[in-house]
Amino acid sequence: MSSSQNNNSSWIDWFLGIKGNQFLCRVPTDYVQDTFNQMGLEYFSEILDVILKPVIDSSSGLLYGDEKKWYGMIHARYIRSERGLIAMHRKYMRGDFGSCPNISCDRQNTLPVGLSAVWGKSTVKIHCPRCKSNFHPKSDTQLDGAMFGPSFPDIFFSMLPNLTSPLDDPRT
């Protein structure tokens, strides 16, 4: 990303553009700024300033760790909201998260899942709603599983009544 592109983009734009972060969806600024959504997160005022201001130069020594964790935890909350579920639904329908490697699942689209809601315990996996198994993603991602949490697939299918898990489909 050139520095001219960075002048008009935020840390969030820069972060989402990093290879391996394609499972994440954009959390809107109004959601990030809402203090209710920040409850329980440490250093939110300092980190909020960094992630919302324009990035001038990606080589200027950004504090990548804290911002990544903070954005990841806000992301985990956002994808459980109505707007977040809609954003993840679009990605799911496009197959952005990949497909199940199990041959009997017939290339079923998958969802990201964390094995723990605790930061640093494991990287993101993909979850097949047909066979209910978790797999390592084929993509080159090292995202923390807490950015999605262990309950995201269940919440996704329970909150989107028009989209049921293929396991519930009487044709399968």
Curated annotation (Swiss-Prot):
Instruction: Please report a single Pfam family linked to this protein.
Output: CK_II_beta
Coiled-coil segments: none
Tissue/organ expression: Probably not expressed in wild-type flies. In males lacking the Y chromosome, it is testis-specific and constitutes the main component of star-shaped crystals.
CC annotations in GO = cytoplasm; nucleus; protein kinase CK2 complex
* Induction section of the entry: In wild-type flies, it is strongly down-regulated by double-stranded RNA (dsRNA) interference mediated by Su(Ste) transcripts. In males lacking the Y chromosome, the absence of Su(Ste) locus, relieves such down-regulation, explaining why it is strongly expressed.
Gene3D superfamilies, alphabetized: 2.20.25.20, protein kinase ck2 holoenzyme, chain C, domain 1
Q: Name one GO molecular function term.
A: protein kinase regulator activity
Q: What does this protein do?
A: Unknown. In males lacking the Y chromosome, its strong overexpression leads to the appearance of proteinaceous star-shaped crystals in the primary spermatocytes causing meiotic drive, possibly by interfering with normal casein kinase 2 activity.
- Miscellaneous comment: There are multiple copies of the stellate gene in fruit fly, encoding proteins that are extremely similar, which makes their individual characterization difficult. Thus, most experiments probably do not discriminate between the different members.
Per the record, the similarity remark reads:
Belongs to the casein kinase 2 subunit beta family.
User: How the protein assembles, per its UniProt entry?
Assistant: Interacts in vitro with the casein kinase 2 alpha subunit (CkII-alpha). The relevance of such interaction is however unclear in vivo.
Kindly provide the name given to this protein in its UniProt entry: Stellate protein CG33239/CG33241
Tell me which species this is from. Drosophila melanogaster (Fruit fly)
